[in-house]
Amino acid sequence: MFRIVRLVALLASAACAAPAARAAGNWVTDAPDFPSSPLCGSGEVTLWTCTAAHKTFSLCAQGGVAAQDAAIQYRVRDRSGKIVLRYPEPMRAPRSAFSYECSANGDAEVDFSIGKIGYALVDPLRDVSFISVTKGDKELAHLRCAEGNQSLQLNDTIALMHALGVPAPH
């Protein structure tokens, strides 16, 4: 029995382990696996997108040949089509702007803060994605995405976050 429990724990922890053979320069090997978003440009990859509360929320990655050339930006578009938020602005290396975690149960999330407001883009392995907006310990908003996602658990996303040195939340 102990062996089975240990094996299950080992397999679960491997679910979000970064592929060792990838480099930031070739991190998109399966571009069709990523969602698409009108908020991300033609030279960018949509790492994550969500439609909720008549808005579109996307995490766009701009790849470079080297890790220091890559950047990630969170964007929000309102119902009129206007981009109302870009973070970080200007776009820069993600290690100073975001944190990333892929847990043993397969859930993954990207966290960041703008001032005293915290944002969590959450991709549960077995449920629909959502955005949690907090201030201190109080949740200000919980936006459930209209579509499923699970793109934060893709091997390419995991490899990119690790290659770029995006830290785990503290």
Model-derived segments and their meaning:
Residues 1-8:
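Bacterial N-terminal signal peptides that target proteins for export
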Residues 8-16:
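Bacterial N-terminal signal peptides
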Residues 19-23:
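Sec/Tat signal peptide C-region and signal peptidase I cleavage site
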Residues 24-93:
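N-terminal secretory signal peptides
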Residues 56-58, 78-87, 117-122, 128, ...:
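Short, surface-exposed beta-strand/loop "edge" segments at domain boundaries and coil↔beta transitions
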Residues 69-78, 110, 128-135:
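Short polybasic amphipathic segments
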Residues 99-132:
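Short, structured surface segments that line ligand/substrate-binding pockets
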Residues 136-170:
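C-terminal partner/receptor-binding element of secreted or periplasmic proteins
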